[in-house]
Amino acid sequence: MPKKKVLLVLLLLPLVSALLLSLPFLVEGVWFIALIALLPLLAAEEIATRRGIKGFWAIYYLAFLIWNLLTTWWVYLATPPGAIAAFTINALQMSLVFGLFRRMRRLTGGFLPYLFLIITWLAWEHCYFNWHVSWPWLVLGNSFATSLSIIQWYEYTGVLGGSLWVLLTNALLFRIIKMKCNGERVALSALSAALVILLPIVASLLIDASLKREIEQEGESGPRAVFAIIQPNIDPYSDKFGGMSQSAQTTQLLQLSAEALDNMPTLGDSSTIVLSPETFLSPDGSRNSLLLEYAPLENSSFRRIYDFATNRGVDYIVGGVTYSIDETAAKRNTHNTAAMIFREGAIEYYHKSKLVIMAESTPFVGIFKPLEKFAIDLGGSVGSFTTQKERSIFSTSNGVKIGTAICYESVYGDFYREYILKGANVMSIITNDGWWGNTPGHRQHLHYASLRAIETRRAIARCANTGISAFIDKSGRIVAASEWWKPQYLNGSLPLEERLTFFVTNGDVIGRVALFLFWLLLIMGVVRALTRGKLSPQGKE
């Protein structure tokens, strides 16, 4: 093949992979594409290796950058600097993983380099969830977020089980293609690939069938929490932070809350919890608009919600920007907070602890501080929110122990399970997805909540300012949902669960094992290269 055609093929194949990787995130029901999405990229790498083409890392980077752009372009609408950082850094890390794989192929042959690729990618995903600067939206296991019946085993593996499935299937299929091209027998390899593809599906369908029977038998019996989810639908750009007074927003919220409670069916002794969205209460620049945790009732809007909750005899979770005093550092901290107003009058707070980069947290301040002026202002505290060290939950007098994940926190499975370890028997998520407009962003965020329900087997009440609010059962299915960009409420009840899944108890086992194996294989590879004299300045690409 002429060199120009080779270069064209080397450019087109990675672009095909970028498109295939994007489709499961953008189109519901095409999960199977993820199982072949890496084949064009692996084929391009094989051609580049055989032709001795240098600088192939740039092609990796282009492919992963396009994948990030196609799938998460909508982030730019909310935070341009954060989006640029997410796109470029994500693509850089992904391409570095494949660069290490390419280096390993120079050191050894057979299937070992592909095993190294699988392990390295899983180790990277595991670490990425825990780094201060992270954007794990495109974890490969998230490809199946709209195809829940085939991933019910996430309660054992977490989302990295899906990533392992994608990587292993692609590697095995590519091995079969190579063997076929070399005239080798592929029957045994084909059987192995078929088992890797089919066994997880069969196992999931069996778990799913059992869960459906369990949910049907439970019905409305057993201990439950009753929810009124309030979706005020306040435009985050034109109204939320300046165009509409906080008093007017609170009036709208309480009117919907009253309507929801007036139409709430009575369910025995079940606790009723009213759920409102993230950062509903936000300062407008005046001191009286500040929500001080040590004197919350001085805030007139919070006082109105407090009076509503105690007079109506309900527990009320409201999102807001709050302020606390750090006595050790003699300074005031700003938090993205879920405040629980108990029917008896007590107040507790939970502070969001996975922050959105460049909107709520500014990494490497010396470099990125000037970019804060381009970020979202959630009430005069761009890039300076304070977190809390451990998860905490709210326990009502009726036995409901509810965890409240705030927005971005629901993307982190290993983090999210900590609510259940603290005793949560039901979960809530409060968010404001209106920043992204009517794009794939808010729908992807909703579907990721389903993954958390599967991993923890905790039903979820999800409240989004502009939608989509929803009730999600423990199998991850959305049993009721609001419309997008419409003020409304949802009434419903969710069962209280006490069982701990394997994933909740043990966490991301796959990621931890992959990280250990990565270092082990890396050391083995370096030792092997040194003994063969293959590591030299001339050998570098």
Enumerate the predicted regions with their spans.
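Soluble catalytic regions of membrane-associated enzymes that act on cell-envelope
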Residues: L205-M358, I393-N398, T404, Y408
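Active-site catalytic loop in hydrolytic enzyme cores
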Residues: V75-P81, C127-V159, K331-Y408, G413
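Non-cytosolic juxtamembrane linkers/loops
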Residues: K3-K5, V196-L267, N432-H445, S450-R457, ...
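Membrane-embedded alpha-helical bundles of multi-pass enzymes
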Residues: P2-K212, N438, A449-A453, C463-A464, ...
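Short, conserved active-site loops that position catalytic residues or coordinate cofactors/metal ions
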Residues: F25-L42, W67, Q231-P232, G268-L292, ...
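Cytoplasmic C-terminal tails of single-pass
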Residues: S536-E541
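CN hydrolase (nitrilase-like) catalytic-core segments centered on the catalytic cysteine
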Residues: N90-Q93, I118-I119, I273, T279-L281, ...
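Short, solvent-exposed loop/turn segments at secondary-structure junctions
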Residues: Y76-L77, P283-D284, I325-E327, W435-N438
